[in-house]
Amino acid sequence: MDILKKSLFLILFLGVVSLSICEEEKRENEEEMEQDDEQSEMKRALWKEVLKNAGKAALNEINNLVQGGQ
């Protein structure tokens, strides 16, 4: 009977440890995904600003060429 109790305790303990490790990995993966999302949003905002400025510069150059030709 004593061996059975020890075996059950060992199985329970290993199950809890396994579950704990899985939860920790899941939490780490979620944190990584959140960081990736934040970085993606920052990159998107940066590209939006760069393209906006490039568009303004191109439009100004076209206006200068049109006005210079008249």
Swiss-Prot record:
Its main location: secreted. It holds the Pfam family FSAP_sig_propep. GO terms for biological process: defense response to bacterium; defense response to fungus; innate immune response; killing of cells of another organism. It comes from the Eukaryota. Expressed by the skin glands. Residues 23-44, 68-70 form a propeptide. Residues 1-22 form the signal peptide. Keywords: Amidation, Amphibian defense peptide, Antibiotic, Antimicrobial, Fungicide, Immunity, Innate immunity, Membrane, Secreted, Signal, Target cell membrane, Target membrane. It is found in: Secreted; Target cell membrane. Transmembrane segments: none annotated. The modification Glutamine amide is found at Q67. GO terms for cellular component: extracellular region; membrane; other organism cell membrane. Antimicrobial peptide which inhibits the growth of Gram-negative (MIC=16-64 uM) and Gram-positive bacteria (MIC=32 uM), and pathogenic yeast Candida albicans (MIC=16 uM). Shows a broad-spectrum of anticancer activities against several cancer cell lines. Also shows slight cytotoxicity on human dermal microvascular endothelium cells (IC(50)=4.85 uM). Induces low hemolysis against horse erythrocytes. Belongs to the frog skin active peptide (FSAP) family. This is Dermaseptin-PH. It comes from Pithecopus hypochondrialis. The lineage of its organism: Eukaryota, Metazoa, Chordata, Craniata, Vertebrata.
